[in-house]
């Protein structure tokens, strides 16, 4: 919408504007073509995504009321549960692992494996369920992944998993809930 309005102003304007950028001349039309790139670099895409009806946006106070203290700290403060403490480590039944915050299905139990790390690990998520970002909390870059619907932090991706992906989605158990096969998945939280 913004780009269309800006283009319309350009089309109706009889003034030709040039912009100086690091010693080069950029005509207005060239500048307008680059607006989407600039806006996405400034985080505009996050604003648009937050308005998507599929997204679940709640403030931290709301999440604190809905979740256990540990789940809140992991999901929305990017904490990590202590290794070996999740009962989901031993979960081997067929079923689906859903986000503990919004109930979005994230992993099929068929993609879970024993990684020996002390956290539930998967080699493949359900399509479109996760988003990623880079974090530097341990100084070196790691790929963090989160629920694409509510943004809740789930864990990190490592390149030491089994075939066919070679990936290990190392998940905080407190960020997941397990739904056994044959039981209805919970409704998505609103």
Locate each region found by the language model:
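N-terminal secretory signal peptides and thylakoid transit peptides that target proteins
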Residues: 17-39
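Short cysteine-rich clusters marking metal-coordination/redox-active sites
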Residues: 99, 147-150
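Mid-length scaffold segments of soluble, non-membrane domains
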Residues: 92-121
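Cys/His-coordinated zinc-binding microdomains
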Residues: 103, 151, 174
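Short, non-ligating residues that shape and space the ligands of small metal-coordination modules
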Residues: 108-109, 156-157, 179
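N-terminal targeting pre-sequences for secretion and organelle import
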Residues: 164-190
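Residues immediately within or flanking Cys/His clusters that coordinate Zn2+
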Residues: 96, 144, 167
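C-terminal segment of N-terminal export signals and the immediately downstream linker at the start
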Residues: 45-77, 81-82, 186, 190
